[in-house]
Amino acid sequence: MFRDVLKTLPQYLIPKHGITALAGYFADVKNPRLKNFLIRNFIRKFDVDMSEALIEDPKSYDCFNDFFIRHLKPECRPLSQSDVICPVDGCISEIGKIERGQLLQAKGKYYSVQELLACDGQLAEQFVQGQFATLYLSPKDYHRVHMPIDAELVSMTYIPGALFSVQPATTRVVPKLFARNERLAIFFKTKIGPMVMVMVGATIVGAIGTSWHGDVKRSKKLERFDYSEQFSDKIISQGSEMGYFKLGSTVVLLFANGEKIQWDKELLAGSKIQLGKPMAIIT
């Protein structure tokens, strides 16, 4: 724990938003020499497997961000026939029941559904006995997010906040981390009731985006988007792309009807998992 504190303490002191803005600027630079340098060194540092990428040649990307949100060859991530599939490549931080409206962040640390979603008590009440899974995307992972189940898009809320790192050490130290950081809460209807996918921002995450909106503009104000009427393509099928991170972060998946979700017993905190793998069955 002491080592985690030492790693985390500087984050309270550095200008996280300024550093993130600067990183975002360089990640969009299209100068061939600079972007190729950034991409080449990133691949080397994080041992990125470019054979899985739809475009294998690193020099073919216009900028670092285009490389970072690269598409994969479909055959590299076949979709299982499970009722609920994993929406990302990543690692399970925590998974299980929402207990009296509280989600487990790390050992001994909790945060509430209402805090995470920045919503009223009536909406949070729907998830008070639900199920959740927190999925951490490391820098080397594929950074597009897909649908875990067929769903109808209802609304989206951009919630401004801090930009702490979401690496495991930070989650063990910073209280209510996912309810403090900038995030995008996306609300869906499914055949088993309400579902929310929360895309959590972090230090040097240049942008969070969705397939229907594009990059969501960073702001100091909470903003809600209602898709109940004006949006035509509201039904998004299982496995379809729904969003992306420009640099890595975390997805928190919430189901309101906890009695209907039975997580795969092999999924434990710390488990690695890939897009399309089985996550849960509907009972």
From Swiss-Prot:
Post-translational modification Pyruvic acid (Ser), affected residues: S249
Cofactor(s) annotated in UniProt: pyruvate
Membrane-spanning residues: none
Main location, first listed in the record: membrane
Record's subcellular location: Cell membrane
Single GO MF annotation: phosphatidylserine decarboxylase activity
First-tier enzyme category under EC: lyase
PTMs per UniProt: Is synthesized initially as an inactive proenzyme. Formation of the active enzyme involves a self-maturation process in which the active site pyruvoyl group is generated from an internal serine residue via an autocatalytic post-translational modification. Two non-identical subunits are generated from the proenzyme in this reaction, and the pyruvate is formed at the N-terminus of the alpha chain, which is derived from the carboxyl end of the proenzyme.
Cofactor note: Binds 1 pyruvoyl group covalently per subunit.
Listed pathway(s): Phospholipid metabolism; phosphatidylethanolamine biosynthesis; phosphatidylethanolamine from CDP-diacylglycerol: step 2/2
Domain of life (superkingdom): Bacteria
Catalytic activity annotation: a 1,2-diacyl-sn-glycero-3-phospho-L-serine + H(+) = a 1,2-diacyl-sn-glycero-3-phosphoethanolamine + CO2
Signal peptide: none
Site features described as Cleavage (non-hydrolytic), chain residue numbers: G248, S249
Active-site residues from the entry: D89, H146, S249
A matching Pfam family: PS_Dcarbxylase
EC numbers for this chain: 4.1.1.65
Keyword Membrane tagged: yes
UniProt record, GO biological process: phosphatidylethanolamine biosynthetic process
Example of a GO cellular component annotation carried by this entry: plasma membrane
Entry membrane topology: Peripheral membrane protein
PANTHER family per the UniProt record, alphabetical: PHOSPHATIDYLSERINE DECARBOXYLASE (PTHR10067), PHOSPHATIDYLSERINE DECARBOXYLASE PROENZYME, MITOCHONDRIAL (PTHR10067:SF6)
Function: Catalyzes the formation of phosphatidylethanolamine (PtdEtn) from phosphatidylserine (PtdSer).
Family the UniProt entry places it in: Belongs to the phosphatidylserine decarboxylase family. PSD-B subfamily. Prokaryotic type I sub-subfamily.
Official protein name in the record: Phosphatidylserine decarboxylase proenzyme
Organism the protein comes from: Legionella pneumophila (strain Lens)
Name of the coding gene: psd
